[in-house]
């Protein structure tokens, strides 16, 4: 979380780029949510996307329900196979791997304003359980207030990054301690995980929009894109899987 211009979207882009450089669409898939319609939509057309970048609140709710259904399906597959997690399952089945799935929300505040209970429930359920089956969450917001980053949500998202924020209160909302209000902006961040006693100050990398576009254009020129429309449709809440 962080204020406008602090480096939040650049950080998301560097994470996405790093994952794209290291994983084919067979190994890793994305669901991306961008209510502002300007940050993540440039990734439309890459083969790693399960569905076009979602800009609609109701479609986001459907996608969260689909993803929790996918999580349950994966747990059933692992149980039937006797595997503890996705890593051990994929080692046993090198020719039939389950891809990891990263669900990215670039502006949580817009979703919480329209569908708070459904969005919060979906995020919490995935944050609590989904990592073992290879489903991961990246959630970002410019407004780190307690009605956006709720206590339950925060309790279930142990790895947090705070960019420059306006006040000590905002810093405490993200990290449970002050400090983010003193950051300098432009990728200056505090990073905290569950096994750290206090946040670590880190300088984020920078990637330009031109560099992102170059990678996206290259990926678009390769594999054919296959989208699953059921992910964002009502009723697509766990009845089918792409994998």
What are the language-model segments listed below?
Residues 3-5, 141:
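The conserved Walker
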Residues 8:
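Conserved lysine of the Walker
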Residues 14-18, 25-32, 39, 62-243:
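P-loop NTPase motor-domain active sites and their immediate coupling elements
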Residues 42:
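Short loop/helix-cap segments at secondary-structure boundaries that form the rim of catalytic
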Residues 50-68:
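Conserved nucleotide-sensing/catalytic segment adjacent to the nucleotide-binding pocket
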């Amino acid at each position: 979380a962080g204020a406008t211009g602090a480096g939040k979207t650049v950080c998301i882009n560097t994470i996405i780029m790093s994952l794209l450089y290291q994983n084919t669409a067979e190994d890793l898939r994305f669901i991306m949510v961008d209510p502002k319609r300007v940050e993540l939509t440039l990734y439309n057309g890459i083969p790693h996307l399960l569905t076009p970048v979602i800009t609609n609140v109701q479609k986001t709710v459907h996608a969260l329900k689909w993803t929790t259904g996918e999580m349950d399906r994966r747990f059933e597959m692992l149980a039937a196979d006797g595997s503890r997690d996705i890593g051990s399952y994929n080692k046993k089945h090198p020719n039939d791997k389950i891809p990891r799935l990263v669900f990215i929300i670039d502006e949580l505040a817009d979703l919480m304003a329209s569908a708070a209970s459904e969005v919060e429930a979906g995020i919490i359920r995935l944050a609590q359980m989904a990592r073992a089956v290879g489903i991961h969450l990246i959630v970002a917001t410019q407004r780190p207030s307690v009605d956006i980053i709720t206590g339950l949500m925060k309790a279930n998202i142990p790895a947090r990054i705070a960019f420059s924020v306006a006040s000590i209160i905002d810093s405490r909302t993200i990290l449970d301690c002050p400090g983010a209000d003193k950051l300098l902006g432009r990728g200056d961040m505090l990073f905290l995980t569950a096994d750290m006693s206090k946040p670590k100050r880190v300088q984020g990398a920078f990637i330009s929009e031109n560099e992102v576009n170059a990678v996206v254009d290259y990926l678009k020129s390769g594999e054919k894109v296959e989208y699953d429309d059921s992910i964002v449709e009502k009723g697509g809440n766990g009845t089918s899987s792409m994998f």
